[in-house]
Structure formats: structure tokens, C-alpha cells
């Protein structure tokens, strides 16, 4: 014969059992931290790189947040010969990619969750002119934009930089991919090709018929940052937390200098004439980042005057 149990006593027993089980079970966040997060990307090295700068910085931010967010692994998409930023944006929107690094533009704001923080320190907006070595003496003498606009210039078609030049009344010859610019210079299709100050020497050192001009550069405010798939907000938050940690300990500046500092120093940026352009496609909110993330010259000559205007 079973002993009758009052409903109130039963309810208390059930509550105590549930509470005990909860104490013995790990919390949800602990379970998620023990899982390995897979991050899909397609950050392939550019011409002149051994490893993509974007991937190097992404690894830093992810490593900084292992203690708070758990382990991770990268899954790189198979290498493709004709990958473009436009193709990567399509894959980000479709879920084929979790994260990509790209120059910011108003047109790209809705393509993913924006993670503010320029991983190139604004140096992607300082463009160094590259030309045939046989024409160096002729082209070093450019003094202002009026003279520069008389030169025929080329950019890769899917780079937002091409649109920046066009919106500053500088007609641009668009080429389909970076790998053909040296051959087209040799054929006389255009006078100069503009490369970012943190990549130009790494690319041109393997092209003996070309030189990076020494006397002038084209400058405009520009940020180059991570975008995350809209379905991965937790990854975006993790990267933002990583940025805060690197700003606090200086590890990003050290990593950036190790990766591309030699190219920036070889460019002698302070000694050049800066031909400054507007960038109407630059999202203004992307400029509101920690001052330490900018290269000092970019901050002094481009960003601070713009923010004070």
C-alpha cells in the first residue's frame, strides 16, 4: 500500500530535485565555450604576401578571446584563381563565408555585420604610384592633382578605390585582376597604377621593370575592416571584444609593424607630396575608432582635420 503524499510536499521535492540537477550540470555558456568554433574565410595572400594580413589580424583577435569565448579553428575556402571582393561579398551574404576583410564603403554597409577597426591603420588610403622604371624621371615631377589628372591611371575594377578616384574627376581604367597590371603598364595601356602604401613594395620587388615613385602619393580617408555574416552576431561580438583587448595591450600595433612595417618605412610617407582627395563613399561612423589604431601620419593629416571640419 503506497503512502499518500500531499501535493505541496511533492512540489517541494520536485523543486529540490531540479535545483540539485542544475547545480550538477554545467551552465550553457560553459558548454558553448568547450565547443570548437569553426570560422570560414577566404583570406588568401595577395601578390607579394606570404600570408594574408587580414588572416593574421583575425587570428590575433580570435587568440585574444579564447579565454573568454572558447577555442576556434579556421576553415579556408579552396584557393581560386579569379576570386574578387564582389564574389566574396556574395558568399558572405549567402552564408558560404563567416567573415571577410574589405575596404569599407557605403555600398557595402548592409552586406554584413560591420566590425569597426581598421586592420590596415588607414594606410590603404595612401596610394603610391607605380610606373615603368623607364618613365620614373618623367613622372616624379607631379606637383598637384591638376597635373596628376592628366595621367592615365588604373585600378582593379572591384576595388572601391576605383570609384573614389572617379568621384574626384580622375578617369580610371578598370582592370579585372591585380595580376595583369604590370603587363598592361608594359604595353602602355596606362601611365600609373596606384597601390596601397602597406603593399606596394612587397608587390613591386618581384617586378624588375617597375618602380614605386618616390616624390608623391594620393591620399584619402579609408578604413579596411572585418565584416561578419549576418547569421553570426556572436562572432562579430567576439571580434569587437578582441579589438578592445589589443587596443589595451598594444599587440595589434606590434603585429602590424612586424607584418608590413618595412614597407611603410620604405615608402618615406612624411617626405612625399600628399595629393589629398575626398572619399564620399567612406562610412563616417567607421572613422570613429580608437586613435591608436590609425597610423600617426594618417591620423594627423587625414582623419583629425576631417573630424574637426
Describe each model-derived feature in a short phrase.
Residues 156-168, 243-308:
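Ligand-binding clefts/hinges and TM-proximal coupling segments of bilobed small-molecule sensing domains
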Residues 43-44, 51, 123-128, 132-135, ...:
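Periplasmic-binding protein-like
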Residues 58-75, 141-147, 157-177, 204-208:
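Ligand-binding cleft/hinge of the Venus flytrap
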Residues 118-163:
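A conserved helix-loop-strand patch within extracytoplasmic ligand-binding domains
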Residues 32-111, 239:
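Extracytoplasmic small-molecule ligand-binding "clamshell" domains
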Residues 2-7, 14-31:
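N-terminal export signals
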Residues 91-93, 100-112, 191-218:
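A ligand-binding cleft/hinge motif common to bilobed small-molecule-binding domains
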Residues 78-98, 167, 179-194, 198:
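Short helices/loops that flank or line small-molecule/ion binding pockets
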Amino acid at each position: 500500500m503506497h503512502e499518500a503524499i500531499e501535493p505541496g510536499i511533492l512540489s517541494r521535492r520536485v523543486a529540490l530535485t531540479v535545483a540539485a540537477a542544475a547545480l550538477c550540470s554545467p551552465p550553457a555558456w560553459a558548454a558553448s565555450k568547450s565547443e570548437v568554433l569553426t570560422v570560414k574565410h577566404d583570406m588568401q595572400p595577395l601578390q607579394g604576401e606570404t600570408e594574408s594580413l587580414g588572416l593574421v589580424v583575425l587570428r590575433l583577435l580570435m587568440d585574444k578571446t579564447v579565454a573568454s569565448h572558447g577555442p576556434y579553428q579556421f576553415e579556408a575556402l579552396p584557393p581560386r584563381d579569379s576570386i574578387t571582393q564582389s564574389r566574396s561579398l556574395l558568399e558572405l551574404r549567402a552564408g558560404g563565408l563567416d567573415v571577410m576583410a574589405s575596404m569599407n564603403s557605403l555600398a557595402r554597409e548592409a552586406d554584413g555585420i560591420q566590425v569597426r577597426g581598421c586592420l590596415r591603420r588607414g594606410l590603404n588610403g595612401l596610394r603610391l604610384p607605380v610606373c615603368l622604371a623607364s618613365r620614373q624621371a618623367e613622372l616624379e615631377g607631379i606637383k598637384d592633382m591638376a597635373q596628376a589628372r592628366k595621367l592615365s591611371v588604373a585600378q582593379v575594377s572591384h576595388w572601391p578605390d576605383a570609384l573614389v578616384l572617379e568621384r574626384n574627376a580622375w578617369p580610371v581604367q578598370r582592370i579585372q585582376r591585380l595580376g595583369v597590371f604590370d603587363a598592361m603598364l608594359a604595353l602602355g595601356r596606362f601611365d600609373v597604377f596606384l597601390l596601397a602604401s602597406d603593399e606596394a613594395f612587397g608587390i613591386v620587388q618581384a617586378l624588375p621593370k617597375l618602380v614605386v615613385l618616390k616624390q608623391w602619393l594620393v591620399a584619402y580617408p579609408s578604413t579596411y575592416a572585418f565584416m561578419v555574416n549576418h547569421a553570426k552576431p556572436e562572432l562579430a561580438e567576439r571580434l569587437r571584444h578582441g579589438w578592445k583587448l589589443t587596443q589595451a595591450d598594444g599587440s595589434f600595433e606590434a603585429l602590424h609593424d612586424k607584418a608590413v612595417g618595412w614597407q611603410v618605412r620604405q615608402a618615406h610617407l612624411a617626405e612625399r607630396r600628399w595629393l589629398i582627395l575626398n572619399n564620399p563613399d567612406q562610412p563616417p561612423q567607421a572613422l570613429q575608432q580608437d586613435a591608436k589604431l590609425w597610423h600617426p601620419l594618417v591620423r594627423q593629416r587625414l582623419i583629425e582635420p576631417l573630424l574637426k571640419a
